[in-house]
């Protein structure tokens, strides 16, 4: 299939989901606000759920928490970078995938700082599909985990 057609379909699907699926909209909004916040050095304001409420700690504590989990090669300068090489850049990874959220409450619980970790961008992209497959085979366990968090 043509790349332009695929892109258009992806955009159309995204727009439809943003209008019709509150859980999708919350997950997307959280990720976008978190990325902007880390680049700006403070939490970005929100009309829905404030990041402070969802993450469960101050911005300063969140940065210290992430830094405590950094590997030797990780720094704020290589946050969000990707070039298909190991140890080039890193992303914020959800330990229990945010894609497992079924309700608004799940979205909030899964975005708590204790469910977030820095992870090599390449590794994060490589295991995303595996996590979703794993989730589909262990729905009951993850539903219980979401309640416990």
Please report, for each region that a protein language model flagged, where it lies by residue.
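Histidine-centered nuclease catalytic patch
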Residues: 75-118
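Generic low-complexity, intrinsically disordered sequence content enriched
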Residues: 10, 21, 120-123, 146
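Short, solvent-exposed loop/turn segments at secondary-structure junctions
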Residues: 37, 97-98, 124-126
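Short microdomains enriched in Cys/His and/or Lys/Arg
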Residues: 66, 140-149
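Contiguous alpha-helical segments
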Residues: 1-89
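General structural signal for secondary-structure boundaries
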Residues: 58, 62, 105-106, 120-121, ...
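Short Cys/His-centered divalent metal-binding micro-motifs
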Residues: 113-144
């Amino acid at each position: 299939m043509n790349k332009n057609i695929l892109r258009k379909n992806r955009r159309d699907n995204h727009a439809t989901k943003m209008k019709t699926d509150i859980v999708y909209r919350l997950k997307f909004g959280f990720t976008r606000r978190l990325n902007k916040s880390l680049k700006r050095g403070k939490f970005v304001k929100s009309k829905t759920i404030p990041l402070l409420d969802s993450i469960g700690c101050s911005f300063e504590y969140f940065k210290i928490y992430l830094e405590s989990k950094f590997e030797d090669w990780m720094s704020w300068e290589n946050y969000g970078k990707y070039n298909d090489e190991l140890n080039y850049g890193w992303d914020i990874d959800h330990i229990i995938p945010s894609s497992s959220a079924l309700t608004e409450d799940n979205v909030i619980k899964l975005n708590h700082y204790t469910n977030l970790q820095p992870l090599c961008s390449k590794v994060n992209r490589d295991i995303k599909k595996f996590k979703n497959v794993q989730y589909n085979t262990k729905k009951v366990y993850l539903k219980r985990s979401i309640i416990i968090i």
